[in-house]
Amino acid sequence: MFILNNRKWRKLKRDPSAFFRDSKFNFLRYFSAKKFAKNFKNSSHIHKTNISKAQSNISSTLKQNRKQDMLIPINFFNFEYIVKELNNQNAIGVYILPSNLTLKPALCILESHKEDFLNKFLLTISSENLKLQYKFNGQIKNPKSVNEIWTDLFSIAHVDMKLSTDRTLSSSISQFWFRLEFCKEDKDFILFPTANRYSRKLWKHSIKNNQLFKEGIRNYSEISSLPYEEDHNFDIDLVFTWVNSEDKNWQELYKKYKPDFNSDATSTSRFLSRDELKFALRSWEMNGSFIRKIFIVSNCAPPAWLDLNNPKIQWVYHEEIMPQSALPTFSSHAIETSLHHIPGISNYFIYSNDDFLLTKPLNKDNFFYSNGIAKLRLEAWGNVNGECTEGEPDYLNGARNANTLLEKEFKKFTTKLHTHSPQSMRTDILFEMEKKYPEEFNRTLHNKFRSLDDIAVTGYLYHHYALLSGRALQSSDKTELVQQNHDFKKKLNNVVTLTKERNFDKLPLSVCINDGADSHLNEEWNVQVIKFLETLFPLPSSFEK
């Protein structure tokens, strides 16, 4: 946070016109300085003692930037950022985070605190060099003066606001929307202007227990010391399976065990690495921060860029979850029979390939209901039927074998594959299936490459078993699959455009950059994929050295 020194504070009070004339703060450059200063002076919640205390905590980096009259870059510009800055100004209110992070969070202020809040809000966006827009009478306004803002906001009970900045290193995190609400006070309760996920009416005797609207900007969920019924009180982990075809030890083993015939199961494009894992981890840190721990399952050495000292990362070798009799393996079907044996994994986890990338902010609710029921994203069409046939895709034959087990167990037929997207998994269900189908699990486990008699455990069996046993439900989330035989340039550019626009309604939950059929030999495909990855996720994550 950028903080004004004592000299600048004195100048603001003594000669506000000169302060804004000389200031490099863009936002309030056009505002009525006298009006702002008058309101600022009348605020009883801003004290010089707070200024002095804040100044004593300025970092050495910030001091260096101040000498150059610069503002430091913002790593993560989001609603949490403005709440933190307002708390630094001793603003008072509550905030409400939506269950779906693509919806707007809300910042709720008492009507009686409106004037004080607006002073601190305008001071914050000024000192942080932020740009403000809001929806008013059906139009998006770019206010030019404090008078205009005050006239607009004092006439309404709630407004959708947009804050943006040019201080981020990535355009994809340079803006966000939120709802500003002004609550009315009755002698017995506080009434919010719109419905919210907790309670529109807050009784005064509730406030005695939690001190909401008394100090700071607090989370409205603190209305109770217990978790809300729609909140998740369980951890969720993330699991990747990863291979590096350039790993020398892997190459030697691959040559030793590779069958004489070629198929999709043995194509080297299945094992090509463009450092997709690096970008996948960036996408999860940016859009899926709710994850407790990340397990990466592999029979290769970790990539040089990965920071294994990060407490959130755990590298898992095949021998830690599979018996020696099944190693080495080059079959994803085999590896996927054993993911629930990862030491220390949560009962609830998300299984993802390194070519699955999150495109927008997500939370636990995108993958599990609060009661633990998993959310599935099955394809809209079905194509799993008939008998296993030599020469047909291995994933399809694996699904057919799984379908045979499901028909015997549940007396129903299934046809839909899971989309190419992160999958919501439960270890208790996987253990249950392994116990029920030991022969099929063991046979698939010991196939070194995908084979005709495999079962697709995570690709098909788990999802329909969980669905038919009442422990999973279908989700309507959209996902995107991009392959070289698609109009891939158009698809990739569309995702980039929607991301820059923060158009969460149209953005898919995830995008899969799917290699196959020797796609690594397609130069245009490789160029466009790398460009897409570097455009969407340019900033290093904390998982990188």
From Swiss-Prot:
GO terms for molecular function: transferase activity, transferring phosphorus-containing groups. It is an enzyme of class 2 (transferase). Its EC number is 2.7.-.-. GO terms for biological process: polysaccharide biosynthetic process. The keyword Transferase applies. Pfam families: Stealth_CR1, Stealth_CR2, Stealth_CR3, Stealth_CR4. Stealth proteins are part of a protein family that is conserved from bacteria to higher eukaryotes. Family members were first identified in microbes as proteins that help pathogens to elude the host innate immune system. Microbial stealth proteins are involved in the biosynthesis of exopolysaccharides. Stealth proteins are predicted to function as hexose-1-phosphoryltransferases. May be the polymerase that links individual UDP-N-acetyl-D-mannosamine monomers. In serotype A the capsule is composed of repeated units of (alpha 1-6)-linked N-acetyl-D-mannosamine-1-phosphate. Belongs to the stealth family. This is Capsular polysaccharide phosphotransferase SacB. The lineage of its organism: Bacteria, Pseudomonadati, Pseudomonadota, Betaproteobacteria, Neisseriales.
